[in-house]
Regions:
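C-terminal helical subdomain
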Residues: 7, 12, 201-211, 217-218, ...
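Canonical Rossmann dinucleotide-binding motif of NAD(H)/NADP(H)-dependent dehydrogenases/reductases
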Residues: 15-52
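Rossmann-fold scaffold of SDR-type NAD(P)-dependent oxidoreductases
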Residues: 30, 104-112, 135, 160, ...
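Conserved glycine-rich Rossmann-like NAD(P)H-binding loop of the short-chain dehydrogenase/reductase
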Residues: 49-63
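Conserved mid-core segment of classical short-chain dehydrogenase/reductases
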Residues: 86, 91, 112-129, 172-175
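Amphipathic alpha-helical dimer-interface segment in Rossmann-like NAD(P)H-dependent oxidoreductases
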Residues: 95, 99, 133-154, 191-192, ...
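Catalytic Tyr-X3-Lys loop
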Residues: 121-140, 159, 183
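Catalytic loop of short-chain dehydrogenase/reductase
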Residues: 151-202, 214
Length: 264
């Protein structure tokens, strides 16, 4: 990242780019290098936000940041390689953002991963070990690192992407569904923190959960041209829903599951 004074000026200038609640908002995106992350960077930049992406893959992060900058020439979009499995590193990242841009108005959690099995009997607990890190530990670290800064914001939002399977797990998805359910529970606890921090007043910050069946993007369609991907959410539609969380009052989305697919 660059000089903090310059970046705070860029954050103020970003207010002129969009027309909605994200004008000038400073939003961090965890898992910014994947297809969903790329779509989120594009949509948030389009809305006039200052976007700070993080990923563990420097090359794909740089490509995602460059794509968002190219699409929206006046946008401030930066990226940083961060180890979200290390709490201190995650806290340092949150602190750098607030110091350089003056505040943090959002964290979008897009760190993903999937492991499944043919049957419940064939469940491999090594899958759980991996998913616990990707889907739970990164949520724990980002919430603990960012919650106070988000509470200080007048429009703080933490957005988790979850799966319908967390509410209705299938036999072959035991590890994945359990991990998603745990991530949801952790996020809902953060939502209760925001509610209580309001001391009886309407909250200005919120933790919300966007629920999908699964995600689809153009590369998947190209690889499987005959697949219907029924019920899947396109990453661009997900990005639109992410941006929409800021358009609603905090009290309306705090602690809520917002369904982008059919509710079980």
């Amino acid at each position: 990242m660059s000089d903090g004074t310059d970046n705070q000026a860029q954050a103020r200038e970003a207010r002129t780019m969009g027309n909605g609640a994200l004008n000038g908002a400073v939003v961090a995106v965890a898992g910014a290098g994947g297809p969903a992350g790329r779509a989120a960077l594009l949509r948030l930049a389009e809305a006039g936000a200052v976007v700070v992406g993080a990923d563990n893959d420097p090359q794909r992060l740089a490509e995602a940041v460059d794509a968002a900058r190219y699409a929206h020439g006046g946008a401030t979009v930066v990226g940083e390689t961060v180890d979200l499995l290390d709490l201190d590193s995650t806290r340092d990242w949150a602190g750098r953002i607030e110091k350089e841009f003056g505040r943090v108005d959002g964290l979008v959690h897009l760190v993903g991963g999937w492991r499944g099995s043919e049957t419940f009997t064939k469940t491999n607990l090594d899958d759980w070990d991996l998913l616990e890190l990707l889907l739970i530990r990164t949520v724990q670290h980002t919430t603990l690192a960012f919650h106070e800064a988000l509470q200080r914001s007048d429009r703080g939002r933490y957005v988790l992407i979850s799966a319908a399977g967390a509410s209705r797990p299938t036999a072959g998805n035991a590890a994945y569904s359990a991990a998603k359910a745990a991530a949801e529970a952790w996020t809902l606890a953060m939502a209760d923190y925001f509610r209580k921090a309001g001391a009886g007043q309407e909250p200005t910050s919120a933790a919300a959960i966007l629920v999908v069946k699964a995600l689809v993007h153009d590369a998947m369609r190209a690889e499987r041209p005959n697949a219907k991907f029924a019920g899947f959410t396109d990453v661009r539609d997900l990005a639109e829903a992410v941006a929409g969380v800021w358009e609603k009052p905090a009290a309306e989305v705090n602690g809520k599951r917002l369904w982008l697919t059919e509710k079980p």
